[in-house]
Amino acid sequence: MTPELQLLGDAIFEAAKKAFLKLFENREHYYYCVVLTTGEALPPCIAAWSVEALERFINENAIPQEEIPYYKYSFADSPYYAFGYEEYFQQVVQLFEQRDSLIDYNNEEQWNEEYNLRLAAMVYAMKKLDETGIFAFNQPREQVYINVELMPPDDTDIERALSLNNPDNIEEWLSIFG
């Protein structure tokens, strides 16, 4: 692991850990926990869904039964989208801004390297979070889909989902997005 990847990954890990731990204080039962970034690999944020939050959302918005699976995994509709971003991700934002100043965006090879480094740092952070047991705080880990997702989603989300989760545990997600 390069020093750049380690530094960025550890910063994302610390920020996401603080945000998820604060979120999990509400004692809800989570099934969707992700780190999100844009297709340009801008500084990430987290998003999450819990069983309780989904139930509230369905009731408040009169969501038809057949549409529930699409909302169930929608970061954009999550009440916990970008949770803790202002409080915990400022160091991550600073690191991304510092790296931005070193990149020649007209150099496609250099930008691709940077993009891949940023995504690798996010994946590293999610793996490290998973190893701490954080996603088993209010529910069994097997019930939680974790990932590093892109906005808008693309096929690489599936690759990362399969590497971060047991495929048997994310069959519903795979049936929708796979």
Features from the language model and the residues they span:
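Short N-terminal edge-element motif at the start of the domain
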Residues: 1-30
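Alpha-helix boundary/N-cap detector
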Residues: 3, 7, 11, 80-90, ...
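Charge-rich, solvent-exposed alpha-helical interaction surfaces
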Residues: 11, 15, 19, 91-98, ...
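Surface-exposed polar/charged interaction patches
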Residues: 18, 22, 26, 98-102, ...
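N-terminal interaction modules that seed assembly of large macromolecular complexes
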Residues: 23-64
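Generic preference for hydrophobic/aromatic residues in regular secondary structure cores
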Residues: 34, 44-49, 71-80, 141-156, ...
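Polybasic, proline/glycine-rich intrinsically disordered low-complexity segments
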Residues: 54-115
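Glycine-rich, aromatic-bearing surface loops/beta-hairpins
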Residues: 131-178
